[in-house]
């Protein structure tokens, strides 16, 4: 099972790849080559930074169609932080920008009246049962760094929510796609458990 962490110039990917290796992903490659990404069994899209810049970089690297095709084929996909937001149709971060459009919905600023960006530990509240959440309990803490939140059209994709001024979507799951607004690689044991659970799901999808 070959896992490719997509490097599109948005953030330090070493901690993500090391966390994946730590939970037993057998072959983890960090690459910005669309040919390498197109042959992956598992794709991981991490990232921090601006939505518009991210989409521009993905397009210039010919990775947009690779990501869409990978997901359409039913192969395992993991999005982290900006990698969750990019799955949606559009974002209003510094203007209006089109996303990958895998999921219907948009990306908007966190609510007024809270400190932005949202940095630090916060709790997960479960919205549905999933193997991804095995070994975790309601109220467990994970680590966030973000200013924007996703608003899915279809609430059934929502895996967890988190309270920051009001409840926002902190993770989603739809078939072969799992994505976290928080950083599992920075969330210590709970984060590694989530990645381990994703690995188990990925193994089922690739055998």
Curated annotation (Swiss-Prot):
Gene Ontology annotations for the cellular component aspect, listed alphabetically: cytoplasm
GO biological process, one term: L-histidine biosynthetic process
Gene3D superfamilies, per database record: 3.40.50.880
Catalysed transformations (reactions): 5-[(5-phospho-1-deoxy-D-ribulos-1-ylimino)methylamino]-1-(5-phospho-beta-D-ribosyl)imidazole-4-carboxamide + L-glutamine = D-erythro-1-(imidazol-4-yl)glycerol 3-phosphate + 5-amino-1-(5-phospho-beta-D-ribosyl)imidazole-4-carboxamide + L-glutamate + H(+); L-glutamine + H2O = L-glutamate + NH4(+)
Pfam families with a match to the protein in the record: GATase (PF00117)
Residues annotated as domain Glutamine amidotransferase type-1: 2-207
InterPro entries listed in its UniProt record: Class_I_gatase-like, GATASE, Imidazole-glycPsynth_HisH
Active site: 81 (nucleophile), 183, 185
Pathway: Amino-acid biosynthesis; L-histidine biosynthesis; L-histidine from 5-phospho-alpha-D-ribose 1-diphosphate: step 5/9
Source species, domain of life: Bacteria
Keyword Iron-sulfur: no
EC code: 4.3.2.10, 3.5.1.2
Subcellular location: Cytoplasm
Single GO term (MF): glutaminase activity
UniProtKB keywords: Amino-acid biosynthesis, Cytoplasm, Glutamine amidotransferase, Histidine biosynthesis, Hydrolase, Lyase
Coiled coil feature spans: none
Main location per the UniProt record: cytoplasm
Protein role: IGPS catalyzes the conversion of PRFAR and glutamine to IGP, AICAR and glutamate. The HisH subunit catalyzes the hydrolysis of glutamine to glutamate and ammonia as part of the synthesis of IGP and AICAR. The resulting ammonia molecule is channeled to the active site of HisF.
HAMAP family per record: HisH (MF_00278)
Quaternary structure and interacting proteins, as annotated: Heterodimer of HisH and HisF.
NCBIfam families with a match to the protein in the record: IMP_synth_hisH (TIGR01855)
Official protein name in the record: Imidazole glycerol phosphate synthase subunit HisH
């Amino acid at each position: 099972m070959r896992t490719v962490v997509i490097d599109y110039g948005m953030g330090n990917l070493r901690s993500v790849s090391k966390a994946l290796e730590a939970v037993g992903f057998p072959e983890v490659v960090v690459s910005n080559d669309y040919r390498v990404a197109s042959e992956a069994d598992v794709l991981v899209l991490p990232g921090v930074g601006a939505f518009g810049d991210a989409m521009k970089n993905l397009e210039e690297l010919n990775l947009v169609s690779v990501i869409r095709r990978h997901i359409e084929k039913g192969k395992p996909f993991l999005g982290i932080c900006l990698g969750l937001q990019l799955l949606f149709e559009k974002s209003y971060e510094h203007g209006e920008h089109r996303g990958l459009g895998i999921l219907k919905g948009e990306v908007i600023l966190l609510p007024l009246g809270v400190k932005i960006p949202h940095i630090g530990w916060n709790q997960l509240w479960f919205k549905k049962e999933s193997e991804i959440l095995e070994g975790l309990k309601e109220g467990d803490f994970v680590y966030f760094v973000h200013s924007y939140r996703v608003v899915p059209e279809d609430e059934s994709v929502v895996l967890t929510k988190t309270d920051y001024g009001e409840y926002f979507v902190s993770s989603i799951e739809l078939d072969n796609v799992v994505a976290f607004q928080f950083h599992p690689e920075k969330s210590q044991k709970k984060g590694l458990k989530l990645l381990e659970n994703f690995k188990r799901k990925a193994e089922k999808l690739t055998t």
